[in-house]
Swiss-Prot record:
This is U2 small nuclear ribonucleoprotein A'. GO terms for cellular component: Prp19 complex; U2 snRNP; U2-type prespliceosome. Belongs to the U2 small nuclear ribonucleoprotein A family. Keywords: Leucine-rich repeat, mRNA processing, mRNA splicing, Nucleus, Repeat, Spliceosome. It is found in: Nucleus. Involved in pre-mRNA splicing. GO terms for molecular function: U2 snRNA binding. Residues 132-170 form the LRRCT domain.
Amino acid sequence: MKLTPASILEAPVYYADHIHGKYDVDKVVILRDCGYVSENEIMPQTLKLLPERTNIVDFTNNELEELPPLGHNDTVHTLLLSRNRLGRLDASRLPRYLVNLNLAMNRFEKFEQLQGLRSAPKTLKNLNLRGNVICHKEQYRETVIALCPQLAVLDGERVRQAERQAAPQNEKTDTPTEGPQPVALQATSEKELQLMDHVVNKMDKDTLEDIKQQLAKATTLAEIERLEKLLSGGVIQ
């Protein structure tokens, strides 16, 4: 489904306290669970119709293969894109003053797919990549931190000074060399993604619906991430 002007006009909008701990501060536009796909004809102009001073855009659980083109936007500080089909990161599409970016449970498998982080807004402090195959790579955290040294939090864990010191420091910020992915590893990656779907499908209908309702009513990033982790088969802590 294409994102149209009508989609924006009809999207739920509410105020929440996701970031600042104060009520009625952040304006949230909900575009989740609609099957939106990436395209470059209508979407760029459509996203310019977001309500004035939108702070959080929720594109969770769609069919996006590219970041939504929000490079023109200077009020969005949080972009929720978990459970899409994203496999590359074009930083020119990110909001100018983005602080929080949730890319959990997408299709990032290789460090090359994250090279765009080099050009991410300097305001980006919180990045979530949990549920992507790349999270299991050797030196994953150190490499991501090297690509985006301004990060303060990665996958819900504060970036430690020891991790910054261990990150590649040469002028090109080299990432671990990766050759062609072995067939066995490709199969493993596909199985991991299938397992996520399998876990969700095994939930009884009432439980799944209850979690989705809680997710729709969640008012903090921590609560959203907790419920999304449950949907992906993770353990609630």
